[in-house]
């Protein structure tokens, strides 16, 4: 296993244990080594989101969409980060995209209704 993979796993384990702050440290190191890995960007975005670092979470989810434009979760997560910053109209657009990419997902549909 590579050092990057070990850092990624360490970050995911910290997230699973509710230690998002610790996760950011490992995941930032992993990202510096492999910035084009969508899985690292997603995990780091989640860690930033859980530590209420909304602009950083937004940046990671945008980067994730650059790498995987049809990723429904990336659109949903970006919408959540945008919503936390009061950017409801832009957030709603990403919720709609997420919902169109994964029709029938209750979480995605509920966010659209909430921002209606």
Q: Could you tell me what each predicted segment is?
A:
Residues 16-29, 51-63, 85-97:
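Structural signature of tandem alpha-helical TPR/SEL1-like repeats
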Residues 83-107, 113-116:
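TPR/TPR-like (Sel1-like) alpha-helical repeat modules
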Residues 4, 38-39, 72-73, 106-107:
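Helix-start (N-cap) detector for alpha-helical repeat units in TPR-like alpha-solenoids
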Residues 1-6, 29:
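TPR-adjacent "capping" and linker segments in tetratricopeptide-repeat scaffold/adaptor proteins
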């Amino acid at each position: 296993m590579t050092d990057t993979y070990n850092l990624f796993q360490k970050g995911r384990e910290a997230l699973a244990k509710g230690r998002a702050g610790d996760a950011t440290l490992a995941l930032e190191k992993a990202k510096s080594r492999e910035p084009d890995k969508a899985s690292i960007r997603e995990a780091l975005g989640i860690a930033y989101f859980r530590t209420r670092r909304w602009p950083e979470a937004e940046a990671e989810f945008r980067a994730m969409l650059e790498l995987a434009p049809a990723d429904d979760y990336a659109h949903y997560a970006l919408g959540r980060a945008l919503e936390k910053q009061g950017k409801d109209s832009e957030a709603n657009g990403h919720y709609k995209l997420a919902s169109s990419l994964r029709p029938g997902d209750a979480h995605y549909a509920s966010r659209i209704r909430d921002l209606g």
